[in-house]
Structures are given as C-alpha cells and as structure tokens.
C-alpha cells in the first residue's frame, strides 16, 4: 500500500509561478497528515578569503541578512497561498547548485516526497527544466512534478513487471485522495520485446503473433484493473510506450500521471531517452514518479 510518511518538501522561488507547486504540496501534506517544508536555494556567495579574515565576517553578515529577508518573503507567500503559519511550515535555506540544494534538503529532513515544478517554454507549455530533471532522477523518494492540470482521471502506467506494480498502488492512493477514477495503461511495443534487430532481419512480426500477444496483455490488464479496483478501467495501446501514455493522458484530460522508475521495459531508470523521462518531460498534467527498489 502506497503511503507517504515523511514530510513533504517543495522547492519554491519568490515569484507567483511557484503558487501552483505550493498548493499541490500543501494538499499532499494535508492529505497524509505530514509536515510541509519549503526549500529555497541561494547561489553560493560565501567566498573563501584566507588572507582577509575580516571579509569573511562581512560576507557572513550579508548572507545572514539575505537569508532572513528570503525567509520573510517566503513566509509571506506561504501564508497567502496556504494560510499556514509556523510551526505548521518549515523553511529550509540552502546554498549552491539548485538541484543539489533540493536533494540535500530532502535527505536532511527525511522527506516522504518532493514536489517541484518545471518551467514554461516560449509556447506557454510546461516542460521539465534541468533542475527538476536532476531531482526526479536522483531523489530517494517519490517526486511530484506539479503542473496546472485538468480535473480528469489518474492514469497509472505499467509494464506488468513486479517492480512496476507499486506505481499502480500509488495511482490508486492518489485517485482516492483526489476523488478521481483510476485508469491503468499498458502499451504493446512488440519489437523491443523480441529484439532491437528483429525487424531488420525478419521484417514486421506476423499479425497473428501480434493478435496473440494483444489477447495475452489484455487478459493481464483486465486482471490488474480488477485487482486494483480501477474504476476508470484499463487502456491497451499499440506502439512505443511514451507516446501512447502521453496521448492517453491528453485524451482523458488526466489530472495526474503515475510512473515507476524500475520496470523492465523502459521504466528501468530515469535516464535520457527512457519512457519515464519522456513522460515526465512532456506530460500535459502533473506527474508522480515512484522510485522502486
């Protein structure tokens, strides 16, 4: 059973673009009755000057003043968006590279989940920035990439390998929390299953083989839908997994996509070109990644 037990950590800037991220983090923390921590990462501004010790003191005071100003600004924004007050909110100020600071803060507080946002491209689309990409890749806990999303279904992807099932558990828990229907999706891409060189030497697999595999996967999907009581049913799509998942999310106007990062057929890890990363980068809604061991 999927359950977040540690505090929720969210990374926040000092602009209104972080409000949606903060709202989703606050809702997650309230649902699981855990503490909410907000992280802000300052650039590394404390220089090492062994020959001028007085400058160390001056710069330390500047950093102290800056951190105090940032805390005040963050707390004001948090109050406006969530109505939270200390001690119901904790603020973590880190220095250095942004993604490293977020990951460090998550480890320090034993985060149960991290909530981050992406960035908006020139076309107004929400895409995954390099900071979010690093956090999704290396965090030791579930990561919610928060985006403005329609109020549709929760869509959980699976390749039916044992490590992938906790992602469906997470999807079920999120569907219950959001009062939404859960839909489970599996994509049939026969060529990677057979061999990356199969088509080059033998051509496309016979249609009868495709039909047999489709029948087999449909049975497994039906069993999965029944086992997890997925009210939104199951979707079996042909073709590469990432485009199939993204297309289904758009068609269903999904409010959340859930993917695991340790399945066998492309969900094995979040690395360049993998199914999980492609989904996180281009999804039209929020995405929850569940790290599976």
Please give the residue ranges for each predicted region.
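Small/aliphatic-rich secondary-structure junction motif
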Residues: 1-59, 151-207, 230-235, 282, ...
């Amino acid at each position: 059973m999927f359950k977040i037990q540690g505090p929720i950590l969210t990374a926040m800037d000092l602009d209104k673009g972080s409000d949606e991220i903060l709202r989703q983090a606050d809702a997650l923390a309230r649902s699981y009755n855990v503490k909410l921590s907000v992280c802000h990462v300052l650039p590394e501004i404390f220089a090492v000057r062994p020959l001028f010790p007085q400058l160390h003191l001056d710069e330390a005071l500047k950093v102290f003043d800056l951190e105090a100003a940032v805390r005040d600004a963050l707390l004001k924004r948090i109050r406006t968006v969530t109505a939270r007050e200390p001690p119901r909110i904790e603020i973590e100020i880190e220095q250095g590279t942004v993604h490293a600071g977020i990951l460090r803060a998550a480890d320090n507080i034993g985060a149960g989940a991290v909530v981050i946002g992406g960035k908006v491209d020139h076309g107004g689309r929400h895409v995954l920035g390099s900071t979010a990409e690093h956090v999704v890749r290396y965090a030791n806990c579930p990561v919610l990439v928060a985006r403005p999303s329609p109020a549709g279904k929760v869509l959980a992807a699976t390749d039916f390998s044992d490590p992938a099932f906790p992602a469906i558990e997470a999807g079920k828990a999120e569907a219950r929390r959001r009062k939404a229907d859960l839909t489970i999706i599996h994509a049939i891409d026969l060529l990677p299953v057979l061999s990356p060189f199969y088509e080059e030497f033998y051509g496309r697999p016979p249609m009868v083989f495709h039909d047999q595999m489709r029948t087999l996967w449909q049975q497994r999907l039906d069993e999965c839908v029944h086992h997890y009581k997925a009210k939104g049913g199951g979707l079996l799509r042909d073709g590469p997994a990432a485009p199939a998942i993204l297309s289904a999310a758009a068609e269903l106007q999904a409010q959340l996509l859930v993917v695991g990062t340790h399945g066998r057929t492309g969900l094995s890890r979040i690395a360049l070109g993998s199914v999980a990363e492609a989904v996180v980068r281009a999804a039209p809604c929020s995405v929850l990644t569940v790290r599976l061991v």
